Amino acid sequence: MSPAALKNMEENKTTVMTTSHSSNDGGETVKGYSDAVEVRFSDFCKSGLALDENTCTQAIKLFKDTKHLLMTNVSSIGNGTSEEAERFWFAFVSYSVKRLSEKNRDDAQQKSDDPGLTLCQILRLAKLNIVDFFKELPHFIVKAGPILSNIYGADWENRLEAKELQANFVHLSILSRHYKRACRELFLTSDASSDKQPAISNEATHVSDHHRFGWLLFLALRVHAFSRFKDLVTCTNGLVSVLAVLIIHVPVRFRNFSFNDSQWFVRKGDKGVDLLASLCNKYDTSEEVLRKSMETTNNLIANILKKKPHSASEYKNENLVNINPDGLIYYEDLMEESSLQSSLNILEKDYDDAIRNKAELDERVFINEEDSLLGSGSVSAGSLNITGAKRKFDLISSPTKTITSPLSPHRSPASHANGIPGSANSKMAATPVSTAMTTAKWLRTIISPLPSKPSAQLERFLVSCDKDVTNDVIRRAQIILEAIFPSSSLGERCVNGSLQSTNLMDNIWAEQRRLEALKLYYRVLESMCTAEAQILHATNLTSLLTNERFHRCMLACSAELVVATYKTVTMLFPAVLERTGITAFDLSKVIESFIRHEESLPRELRRHLNSLEERLLDSMVWEKGSSLYNSLTVARPALSAEINRLGLLAEPMPSLDAIAMHINFSSGCLPPVPSLQKHETSPGSGQNGDLRSPKRPCTDFRSVLVERNSFTSPVKDRLLGNLKSKLPPPPLQSAFASPTRPNPGGGGETCAETGINVFFTKINKLAAVRINGMIEKLQPSQQHIRENVYRLFQLILSHQTSLFFNRHIDQIILCCFYGVAKISKLNLTFREIIYNYRRQPHCKTLVFRSVFVDWSSARHNGRTGQDHVDIITFYNEIFIPAAKPLLVDVGSAGTTVKASNVPEVGNNKDGQCPASPKVSPFPSLPDMSPKKVSSAHNVYVSPLRSSKMDALISNSSKSYYACVGESTHAYQSPSKDLNAINNRLNGNRKARGTLNLDNDVGLVSDSMVANSLGLQNGNCASTSGAALKSEQSDS
């Protein structure tokens, strides 16, 4: 190890001690620091937050119990200083106590004279912003989780609702931007008669009273009407209804539009502008939905503000000139100066009462111009393009920032960009709101009109089974979807004041979502059955259509797409797994088929499913309670002892009757079907699920947000050949058969062995993509280790599979990088590896900050039990003892040795399952995120690195290619050439020959060219193993 690396290691080792000592004039002992920080927290609670005695006592107790965690993790919290770490810890503890203790109170206690406490108040006192708070909160949850569980019970994480709160913040950030943009477009911030400058010239430095009124009215809708289901689509519809109210009532002198001039106002007949139709056309909602939302908003105004409604058609006012008044309601003086301030005060008080003492986000922060509290990040139009200081926000919110996944197929090239022909605003830059509304339009226009029962074609398949399973399928769908989208019980709370209970709206919402999921389920199931029948050359699909687990996976996938469409805050993944009784491994089997068999699926939902598949494969399938382990015990008996010792096996999947009883389901005229659970429930079947996915250390805290996500099209797959088998897809029924059952086409394999081999192939493919992404961030002189890193990963997956148990595959990849760097004598530190990992779109800081270890499995200086440690400790204590023989093998063999010549490892503890995939060279990969070419923008060309260009183009063929930097005309510059290309692309286009450049099936990547030339991956020299020593990671 280099002297510089040793110095860094020693500096990092002493970070905690140094910061602790320096926190109080440089002379404070550890014990003194501990006592002093406790005193400071006590003052924070009593004087700063003014907590009541009971809550304050609880907070101080929790702080004492977790204080040692603060002191040992100072360097990894915030910027690494003890002062900032303290402020974060103070906020975490006070938020957790307030939130969890509040859940233990009854409503009578909550309605006391307690002034209340919101998250914003906590953060103001701690001098933190919301973005940074959510960025660091997962680390506190992982570290303090066992302590919180002991104090508040096993369900503390569900009651804390931290992920839901974060999702709520992201959605409100998006909605507030959407609302501000609309207000700037429609209204002036000052009287037009005195100031002709529109609001758009003043970058939101001033929020008008009209703007404030609209946002507070929207918050009242969220509190009183939307109840538990504050999904993005419903909220957007509510916001559009608020805009309609503003357009009708804001005095004409504040308007920044004219009904005669504006192109987006729709006229029907000679009665004037149809306002609701115009808003629906602009914001991709439906008139039926908007009218219902308008009715709710109008009732809210009448009940809270005590305003008398008038029919607009019977009321004469200059605000209503040029507007078709049919069906509209007008409130006299609603937004005139004489009553506006009073209305604002009433709405403020109503909101104060609603959030009192709940430690929730004060949603008024988005119009209070408190940028310091919101943080430096913001949502930009089209996507969350974060630059500079704003990049932090991207760590916790990226609704549309996606890359494609190599794990599942793309949609058919014939399908439309969004699954909807001729969707509106196709040339406008997409925003998170417009994307959500377009996706919801797909559900509304393509799925909702379908019948809510099996089609005639599907029914033919159901009847063709050994026995008619139609009633079984219908009953199961009803029960499972009722479990996923439950109706409100009669005993649930009602809203304050004179407004009626929100139960009715909740029930309507749930019923609509159940119907959409049901229709989608039947549609895809029919398509799958048709494809399966073609593969098997038979219409009797008994094995598949009587498989309980398969149907639950299909229902879960359909429901998840509905939830993702509406972006429902209170039903974040893996809620569908928990409510259907399946596991992540089960769901991963159907995602690819689901995408293949629903060609109309919008791009955003395809991305969501691929993002989900990556998340399932990289961590969730490896968690405790995954049915993967049940299959592994059959496919790899040598792993059974370790699996049983760690208690990883999935529990039996709950019966359908048990779920029905749990949700108090009434099946109506359909009798109970005792035969439903005859399949897959025998002891030792190994395919049993768990009603609740076991809790994990919140490694996917950003689950609400769309993560790195990337897949290739069938066209690219055919061109790249080696990424996917050219054989027809295997029958689905073998994927869901009992693990011990022989696979009909598996050459003597059991279904478990076949399933594990397919699964390992996907894991290797995902690893190849991620290894390649990190390699590209390294220096050119370091990139030759790619083959060896990938080879080592494959060997570990095959020979030391237990290293993946309860861990994230990125943790193994990071260790592979460092191990190969050491045996190659490459000057690549763990700090550099982690720095490059941080730059990956799928990066999660918990991957290198918190790695699961089980000390009882080996001799570790007397340490016992299970723990979470940093990546360096895991590498030295667990990874190296297990993987060292494989590292030596990789180092001695080098990349020139063929995969078939890899020697067996002497101490192969896990063994290799029969017919498992051989170690293969690094595959040719498609470009992960090709820049889509839009007809409204210039073409973006990325320079080709000289090293890549030299590998791509040999001397003999160089004359056939034009490279960036070389002019295509005499005395021309590359910039002029690129401008010429842009001018040609963006020039006059004939309507009949519109070029659709939104589909990526026509893009040709460098990797395709490389494959077409038959180029092989470059070889690299590698030397034998060297001493493997510690470094401290940059945490």
Swiss-Prot record:
GO terms for cellular component: chromatin; nucleus; transcription regulator complex. Residues 431-632 are annotated as: Domain A. The keyword Transcription regulation applies. Keywords: Cell cycle, Nucleus, Repressor, Transcription, Transcription regulation. GO terms for biological process: cell differentiation; negative regulation of G1/S transition of mitotic cell cycle; regulation of transcription by RNA polymerase II. Residues 403-426, 674-697, 721-748 are annotated as: Disordered. Residues 431-885 are annotated as: Pocket. It is found in: Nucleus. Its main location: nucleus. It comes from the Eukaryota. PANTHER family: RE32990P-RELATED, RETINOBLASTOMA-ASSOCIATED PROTEIN RB -RELATED. Regulator of biological processes that recruits a histone deacetylase to control gene transcription. May play a role in the entry into mitosis, negatively regulating the cell proliferation. Formation of stable complexes with geminiviridae replication-associated proteins may create a cellular environment which favors viral DNA replication. Belongs to the retinoblastoma protein (RB) family. This is Retinoblastoma-related protein. The lineage of its organism: Eukaryota, Viridiplantae, Streptophyta, Embryophyta, Tracheophyta.
